[in-house]
């Protein structure tokens, strides 16, 4: 019988080599185009290999396996691969979504002269995520973690001629540097107290792990997954091209923080206060983001805040000590969120770059395929039955209501679920119904290069939910006495929110609100939160640093060039004069002899 673990390791290494080779070939000169390997074909090959690895893993009785590639003696910086349920499933999903995005990029970025370079950056972005997922050592995890932050800056600020894009890229990398501080804190603790960076050693010595590495991982996840307080960079990242937004929000960087906590959950769950911290962060993020999405009119900003809200749900689920359920929602969210962004980019392209949903209507008549897929994605986001979002959100709400957590957290998450259904329906009705604003749109034709990847993601958004519900490991033992009201809670919230949204939209259309509306006040309040983190806090830090700098300057003038300096220069002279013995006869005789000699020289010479 062949060594199946060795085959799995070989397949994973082959996938990385194929991606790296394809990325390098994109930089070959045009004269060597025949030698280049199309990134889309490379993604197809790697995706098929990943499916093969999943089938092989099912045949192995062990839940996970570790394979070492390189084992130096210093600090145990082993390049080892972790092959388990989480890594194999998520790598396959990331490859499938990236392949669809690369196909979409050919149409969306067709006029960009650096299309090959852009594709290479997308591949490197994916490779860094795969390295982070598959690593069984903190060192390669740190390399993948940091590379994701760097690639996010390069991709978000791709249109560097625009000030907003450059500023958003800098904002993203600065917030990610804060997350890196947390990861490096855990990294340094492992070197100092364990003399090893191996994850198996870290888990084996769980009783010795203090609050420092736990705090570092929480800080890292909070920054990378844009939790409340460190969230402003995620909506700002919408200034990048649509393929970047789709890949960033679905299967790469923003999911890395939650994935870190899922992978480290066996040791994190033993720490007192960890569950409460995750629940607080997740509930606050979900409620704030869903509330903010209600007030937005920019299409991509609404989708960005919806991602933020779902990340809060995942974080709260980790806090409920259900990592499998959080991972399931992470995977389900990836499909419909990538499809939603690609549809938004297609709709905006058809409207000559317009992103304000108040200026969109009747797109179902203009782009029927894209509009239908967009409707499917919004329904999946709202948790409509038998779509991907339903299978995970229904279980999350059911788990929340059956758990013994504080009802404040449960209420915040349930209100966030209602808000999600409301802004999802608002987007759908605003964009798809009504009469098109532009007559030219009636002749618009959807490009197959654009619609094919969207339709593939739509099919995945329909099928994968039921597949996951069959093959996901058990989350908990089902309770036989579960009340029907709890079982139908998610479905009830979805339909209640839908009816409420339709009523509010009809009310707004029939009776427009005055200029000084509650919505404007709420928007201003939301902006003030960003001002606190970006203005007030920074102003106080600058004032404190300025005060310190002035104190240092004053001390310098006082000690180096002021009274202290004069005092220091006079002390040696005074010390020399104070060493005289006070013998007046001796001094007078020396003076007299010197005077006689000088007088003799002056008279006779």
Swiss-Prot record:
- The membrane-spanning stretches of this chain are 11-31, 49-69, 77-97, 120-140, 141-161, 178-198, 202-222, 244-264, 273-295, 302-322, 325-345, 371-391, 408-425, 457-477, 488-508, 584-604
Q: Does the keyword Electron transport apply?
A: yes
Q: Which E.C. number(s) belong to this protein?
A: 7.1.1.2
Q: Which GO terms describe its molecular function?
A: NADH dehydrogenase (ubiquinone) activity
UniProt keyword annotation of Mitochondrion present: yes
Q: Which GO terms describe its cellular component?
A: mitochondrial inner membrane
Q: Where in the cell is it found?
A: Mitochondrion inner membrane
Query: What's this protein's name?
Result: NADH-ubiquinone oxidoreductase chain 5
Give the catalysed reaction(s), semicolon-separated.
a ubiquinone + NADH + 5 H(+)(in) = a ubiquinol + NAD(+) + 4 H(+)(out)
Q: Which family is this protein grouped under?
A: Belongs to the complex I subunit 5 family.
Which top EC class applies here? translocase
Q: Topologically, how does it sit relative to the membrane?
A: Multi-pass membrane protein
Q: Which Pfam families match?
A: NADH5_C, Proton_antipo_M, Proton_antipo_N
Instruction: Please provide the Gene Ontology terms (biological process) for this protein.
Output: ATP synthesis coupled electron transport; electron transport coupled proton transport
Q: Which gene encodes it?
A: MT-ND5
What disulfide bonds does the UniProt entry report for this chain?
Answer: none
List the keywords (alphabetical).
Electron transport, Membrane, Mitochondrion, Mitochondrion inner membrane, NAD, Respiratory chain, Translocase, Transmembrane, Transmembrane helix, Transport, Ubiquinone
Q: What does this protein do?
A: Core subunit of the mitochondrial membrane respiratory chain NADH dehydrogenase (Complex I) that is believed to belong to the minimal assembly required for catalysis. Complex I functions in the transfer of electrons from NADH to the respiratory chain. The immediate electron acceptor for the enzyme is believed to be ubiquinone.
């Amino acid at each position: 019988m062949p060594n199946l673990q060795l085959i799995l390791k070989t397949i994973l290494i082959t996938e990385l080599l194929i991606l790296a080779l394809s990325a390098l070939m994109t930089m070959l000169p045009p004269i060597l185009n025949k030698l280049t390997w199309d990134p889309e074909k490379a993604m197809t090959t790697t995706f098929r290999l990943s499916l093969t690895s999943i089938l092989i893993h099912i045949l192995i009785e062990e839940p996970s396996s570790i394979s070492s590639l390189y084992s130096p003696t210093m600090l145990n910086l082993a390049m080892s691969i972790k092959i388990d349920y989480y890594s194999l499933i998520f790598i396959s999903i990331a490859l499938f979504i990236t392949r669809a995005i690369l196909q979409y990029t050919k149409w969306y970025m067709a006029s960009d002269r650096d299309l090959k370079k852009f594709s290479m950056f997308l591949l490197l972005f994916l490779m860094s995520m795969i390295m982070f997922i598959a690593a069984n050592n903190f060192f390669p995890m740190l390399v993948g973690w940091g590379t994701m932050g760097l690639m996010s800056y390069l991709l978000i600020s791709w249109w560097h001629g625009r000030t907003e894009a450059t500023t958003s890229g800098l904002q993203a990398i600065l917030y990610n540097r804060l997350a890196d501080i947390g990861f490096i804190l855990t990294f340094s603790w492992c070197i100092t107290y364990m003399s090893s960076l191996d994850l198996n050693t870290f888990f084996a010595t769980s009783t010795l792990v203090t609050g420092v590495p736990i705090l570092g991982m929480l800080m890292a996840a909070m920054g990378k997954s844009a939790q409340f307080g460190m969230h402003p960079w995620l909506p700002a990242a919408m200034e990048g091209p649509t393929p970047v937004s789709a890949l960033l929000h679905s299967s790469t960087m923003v999911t890395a923080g939650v994935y870190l906590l899922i992978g480290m959950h066996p040791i994190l769950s033993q720490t007192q206060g960890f569950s409460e911290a995750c629940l607080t962060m997740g509930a606050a993020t979900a409620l704030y983001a869903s509330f903010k999405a209600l007030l937005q009119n920019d299409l991509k900003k609404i989708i960005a805040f919806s991602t933020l809200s779902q990340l809060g749900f995942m974080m709260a689920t980790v806090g409920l000590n259900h990592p499998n359920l959080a991972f399931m929602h992470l995977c389900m969210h990836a499909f419909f969120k990538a499809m939603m962004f690609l549809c938004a980019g297609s709709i905006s392209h058809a409207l000559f770059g317009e992103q304000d949903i108040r200026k969109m209507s009747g797109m179902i008549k203009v782009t029927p395929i894209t509009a239908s897929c967009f409707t499917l994605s919004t329904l999946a986001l709202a948790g409509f039955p038998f779509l991907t979002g339903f299978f995970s959100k229904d279980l999350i709400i059911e788990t929340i209501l059956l758990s013994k957590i504080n009802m404040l957290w449960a209420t915040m998450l349930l209100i966030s679920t209602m808000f999600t259904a409301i802004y999802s329906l608002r987007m759908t009705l605003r964009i798809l119904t009504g009469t098109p604003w532009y007559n030219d749109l009636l002749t618009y034709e959807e490009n197959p290069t654009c619609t094919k990847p969207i339709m593939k993601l739509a099919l995945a958004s329909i099928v994968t939910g039921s597949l996951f519900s069959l093959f996901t490991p058990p989350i908990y033992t089902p309770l036989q006495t579960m009340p029907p009201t709890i079982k139908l809670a998610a479905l009830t919230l979805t339909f209640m929110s839908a009816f409420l949204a339709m009523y509010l939209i009809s009310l707004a259309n029939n009776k427009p609100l005055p200029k000084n509306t509650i919505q404007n006040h709420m928007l201003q309040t939301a902006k003030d939160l960003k001002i606190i983190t970006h203005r007030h806090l920074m102003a106080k830090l600058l004032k404190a640093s300025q005060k310190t700098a002035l104190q240092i300057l004053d001390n310098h003038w006082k000690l180096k060039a002021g009274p202290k300096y004069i005092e220091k220069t006079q002390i040696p002279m005074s010390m020399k004069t104070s060493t005289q013995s006070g013998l007046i006869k001796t001094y007078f005789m020396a003076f007299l002899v010197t005077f006689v000699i000088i007088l003799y020289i002056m008279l006779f010479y």
